[in-house]
Amino acid sequence: MLPLTAAITAGGASSRFGSDKALALWQGRPLLDQVAAGLAACERRLLIAPPGKYALPGWETWPDTRPGEGPLAGLEVALTHAAPGWVAFTGVDNPALTSDYWLTLLAACRPGMSSVQALHPERGPQPLGALYHTALLPRVTGLLAAGERRLRLTAPAEQTVLVTGLGAHFFQNVNRPADLAELSGRGEESLEV
């Protein structure tokens, strides 16, 4: 088991997708199941979603306490209910994040750091699909109370470890049906670290 709490946020409206993207199929399985499979080895697993909306055996479901306020609000719920330590946090629209991806981030954890994020070769740090320490909870709550919604502000830069060398294919975010079609065209062989 990985010494992490896994957390998937699945409370968005899927407005750009046109239907519930958590249930959209990729490689014959719903996106939610694909994302959960990459995090299956985590000691504790949290699904941030409306109660009763999804069935994910072995996962605790917690409602988004600030619906409509984005992934930062989902992270607040995850940090609140996680075991003390590191949380592997991602969205339902990141199905290419394998267990090897999470192991790579976990190996980069350092004392005194509060986040571990993959560094996209072109777009920089990736705050969704990252590790966050539960010590960040007061900061996240403060950001939300101040009206902030940007996940990238969660951890101070000097407390963030950036992991290089991960392929760009890990960062395919499924927001539209065309994104899912593009991801499907890549196949499984491109999803290794």
Curated annotation (Swiss-Prot):
Where in or outside the cell is it found?
A: Cytoplasm
> GO molecular function: any one?
molybdenum cofactor guanylyltransferase activity
Keywords associated with the record: Cytoplasm, GTP-binding, Magnesium, Metal-binding, Molybdenum cofactor biosynthesis, Nucleotide-binding, Transferase
Coiled-coil region: none
Q: Which domain of life is it from?
A: Bacteria
Cofactor(s) of this protein: Mg(2+)
Locate the residues binding GTP: 9-11, 21, 64, 93
Recorded GO cellular component terms are:
cytoplasm
What exactly does this protein do? Transfers a GMP moiety from GTP to Mo-molybdopterin (Mo-MPT) cofactor (Moco or molybdenum cofactor) to form Mo-molybdopterin guanine dinucleotide (Mo-MGD) cofactor.
UniProt remark on domains: The N-terminal domain determines nucleotide recognition and specific binding, while the C-terminal domain determines the specific binding to the target protein.
Instruction: Output this protein's name.
Output: Probable molybdenum cofactor guanylyltransferase
Organism of derivation: Deinococcus radiodurans (strain ATCC 13939 / DSM 20539 / JCM 16871 / CCUG 27074 / LMG 4051 / NBRC 15346 / NCIMB 9279 / VKM B-1422 / R1)
